[in-house]
Amino acid sequence: MKKWLLAAGLGLALATSAQAADKIAIVNMGSLFQQVAQKTGVSNTLENEFKGRASELQRMETDLQAKMKKLQSMKAGSDRTKLEKDVMAQRQTFAQKAQAFEQDRARRSNEERGKLVTRIQTAVKSVANSQDIDLVVDANAVAYNSSDVKDITADVLKQVK
């Protein structure tokens, strides 16, 4: 009797694990991220947000290059010394503004990326719950999957609005 119960329990455990395998799905997060980013126009939003500062930096760079060219053609004297100091100060200001611009742009890009990831994760959870899926794995993290593993990428993309 004890062996029979043990065999029945083992059979039940194997059947449960085989049944759980049916509730696994994959999703292509890279593709989703790219498509959702295009759909929402995140890159255009960021570009418009930083357009003014980028054009100011370009103007500063052009002005600085013109002054450096003028400085190279000048002979030694008080005007040259004054222009050298001006160029050095402008170069330092430009470097500081460029660094601040890059940091702000990277910070905003990360914020927008985080928002997209949150939206995608919420959609993945919603689709997984509606389709009774227990485990969703990124398709790029899977070394092999058989053809019977469900790909919910299209369903998730529809869910993300």
UniProtKB/Swiss-Prot annotation:
Organism, scientific name: Escherichia coli (strain K12)
InterPro entries assigned to the protein according to its UniProt record, in alphabetical order: Chaperone_Skp (IPR005632), Skp_dom_sf (IPR024930)
Stated name of the protein: Chaperone protein Skp
Free-text comment about domains: Composed of a compact central beta-barrel domain with long alpha-helical extensions that form a three-pronged structure around an internal cavity. Substrate proteins may be bound in this cavity.
GO biological process annotation, one example: protein folding
Similarity-based family: Belongs to the Skp family.
Cellular location(s): Periplasm
Protein's job: Molecular chaperone that interacts specifically with outer membrane proteins, thus maintaining the solubility of early folding intermediates during passage through the periplasm. Required for the efficient release of OmpA from the inner membrane, the maintenance of its solubility in the periplasm, and, in association with lipopolysaccharide (LPS), for the efficient folding and insertion of OmpA into the outer membrane.
UniProt-recorded Gene Ontology molecular function terms: identical protein binding; lipopolysaccharide binding; unfolded protein binding
Gene this chain is encoded by: skp
Additional free-text comment from the UniProt record: Does not require ATP for its activity.
Renumbered residue ranges of the record's region Lipopolysaccharide binding: 97-108
Classification via SMART domains: OmpH
Source species, domain of life: Bacteria
Pfam assignment, any one: OmpH
UniProt key word Signal: yes
Keywords in alphabetical order: Chaperone, Periplasm, Signal
Signal sequence, renumbered to the chain: 1-20
Gene Ontology CC: one annotated term: cytosol
tRNA-binding found in the keyword field: no
Subunit (UniProt): Homotrimer. Interacts with OmpA. Interacts with PhoE during its translocation across the inner membrane, but, in contrast to OmpA, release of PhoE from the inner membrane is not dependent on skp. Also interacts with LamB, OmpC and OmpF.
